[in-house]
Design a protein with these regions (language model features):
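N-terminal acidic leader/helix
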Residues: 1-24
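Charged low-complexity stretches with an acidic bias
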Residues: 1-7, 55-71
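Intrinsically disordered or highly flexible coil/loop and linker segments, enriched in small
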Residues: 17-20, 43, 61-65
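A short, compositionally biased N-terminal segment around positions ~18-40 that is enriched
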Residues: 19-39, 68-70
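Short, charge-rich amphipathic interface segments used for partner binding and complex assembly
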Residues: 29-61
């Protein structure tokens, strides 16, 4: 896994379609779903760690974008 799209596609394979209209909210829900897949032993450690790293980096980028938006 290298991108958020890869993670979305992985979650779709297991019947999880996440879209709330709030990008950060979506990412947090994706993180929760990834954690559940790992706890269920569907994902191995490497996939789990990779997915969490990608999601957390994306959350950080999204928060920075929101702070840089000028009104």
């Amino acid at each position: 896994m290298k991108t958020i799209l890869d993670i979305r596609n992985l979650l779709r394979q297991y019947g999880s379609f996440i879209y709330t209209g709030d990008r950060i909210g979506d990412l947090i829900m994706m993180e929760d779903e990834i954690r559940e897949l790992y706890k269920s032993q569907i994902l191995d450690v490497k996939e789990y760690q990779s997915a969490l790293l990608i999601i957390r980096n994306e959350i950080k980028l999204e928060e920075e974008r929101k702070m840089n938006v000028k009104y």
